[in-house]
Amino acid sequence: MSKIDLTINKEGLLHNIQTAKENNIIIPTIAQMQNPDLIPEKIKEKLTHTGLWDVDPVNLFRISWHNEAKETGGLYQKTPNYVEIPSSVSGVPCRILAMSGKWFPTGCHKVGASFGCLAPRLVTGQFDATYHHAVWPSTGNYCRGGAFNSKLLACDSVAILPQDMSKERFDWLKTIAGQIIATPGCESNVKEIFDKTWELKQDPSMMIFNQFAEMGNPLWHYNVTGYALSDLFENVKKPGQRLAGACFTSGSAGTMSAGDLLKERYPGMKLAVGEALQCPTILDNGFGGHRIEGIGDKHIPWVHNVKNTDMVIDIDDEDSQRLLRLFNCKEGQEYLKTLGLSDEQIEKFTWMGISGIANVLCCIKFAKFYELTEDDVVVTVLTDSAVMYKSRVEELNEMYGAYSAQAAELDHNLHMLNLKTDSMLELTYPERKRVHNLKYYTWVEQQGMSVEDLNAQWYDTKNTWDAVHAQAKELDELINAFNDEVGLLKAL
């Protein structure tokens, strides 16, 4: 696995600089995403009268976990937005902190991962905004983020996603993406997406940004999501509390690199990866369709640092579906009040989308496995919110009938409090290597990666994962040079 290629293409770079001038585009640095205090005051002033989802280049500066929880006019805050799951809900004594992606543009943190993939090629000129189309293969949210960033950066985009994804995804994409391609199947049908990208690759104007293989994805999550989770923990921890673990379900596995950063800062913690029980690829070399939208794609992503992963946790998709209804129906919210939750806490539970709920369930199983106490904290992220799944709640109501307080109590007990430590595995060295070796069949046999790079991921951490994570500084230098050539910062 080589580092991100930052070779300059002078012709493409000149075209991109001119495009940026014409469209008033200033590109934020990774450092500014980590610490919004570094953002110029004139840009912040413009944000005070810009909506969170507005198609305005200034919203590139809202690719941050530190946004205020406002639909319009929001600036930044020291502590990232998060949902804490009380013990009365989780059934475990430890603290579970889930950092919210709802307050990114598009309502999902994938706008960050897609930036991490596009920005290096844009500021080097490898991607020419006047010639190339940005192709975003995805199981839903990544192509939304990629299409949004493409629009802000004045690039043409092609979104590819499975036809069975939620209606809300397609409705929104129709307003943003230049072209939408729906591939056969559901969440776990990524092979069909890859096949479509190979077809599109025959056209030299189509540039593929494959989140499962692009090292810009883990670079962004390590340097932005990882730092934000550390900020969150440090800002809300109580005396004597320790960070015991982080749990992330794997779609592209980009967020697992946030865990790499956390393990460096908190050496005693453990990092767990989650997947759907109906598609147990990591746990059991398994396969199958499932309903946890955004994760679990019947392969091991190229960008997953498996060697640094301590545990795999499988979540039944029925649990996340039932809890989505509990948290988003009036009857379920009334039930949550009986557990002592405030109106503010209940509102925050709507910040959890389906994969976010699965992440929280991973944290609960993790806590039960390690018998965590009040002194322990487990962190995760909420990729998106329930906004993307209102149609799914309606489908559940049609499937199971009208909701009630009794059904809510039953769902809570069966699908959260009743979680066991089954279908999970603390990974030994040989077991991690077994998972890592699965990459061969997708990436070497099918997608053109080399055995040498595959082995380097396992045996040479310093020149692979560590080297990619460290490229943020070099990328920022290129972004600053690009902005200087565009000249808009000086004119602020």
Question: Where on the chain are the PLM-derived regions?
Answer:
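PLP-dependent amino-acid enzyme catalytic core
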Residues: 1-492
